Amino acid sequence: RMAPSAVNKQPWKFVVVKSEAARKQLQECYDRDWFKSAPLYIICMRELDSNWIRKEDNKQHGDIDVAIATEHLCLAATERGLGSCWVCNFNVAKETFPYTGFGPIAIIPIGHIADDCPLNEKKRKALEEITDFI
């Protein structure tokens, strides 16, 4: 709730999917075994008509705003010892929790990381490669 957004529009809605029936329904839009093991999901949605647009270049900021809030959510889960994953390549046509005036941006599965989960080291570019100091 504390994430910033362009001109404080807060163009988001978060749908927490907890019940077994609802989870099974949601799993049809992203058919991966690891995804199906999550005890809950959060569908991160953007309000379609509440999108600040920068006048100079018509850049829309709704998706950016939802992304900022979603990452705050993921960081909060991590701080509590939970695992999360940003899923955006789901089949939107099979995402079956429509909310009038909202569109899904990402689905975040959240749960405890299995003890036998292979944790891959994150490959990140060097600071010098992504940052210029002027």
Q: What are the language-model segments listed below?
A:
Residues 1-40, 46, 134:
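N-terminal amphipathic, basic helical "cap/leader" segment at the start of enzyme domains
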Residues 6, 78-79, 100-101:
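Arginine/glycine-rich "motif VI" loop of SF2 helicases in the C-terminal RecA-like domain
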Residues 20, 48-49, 90-93, 114:
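Acidic, glycine-rich active-site loops and adjacent beta-strand->loop/helix elements
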Residues 35-36, 94-113:
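Short, conserved aromatic-histidine micro-motifs
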Residues 42, 57-97, 108:
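Small-aliphatic-rich amphipathic alpha-helix that forms the alpha element of a beta-alpha
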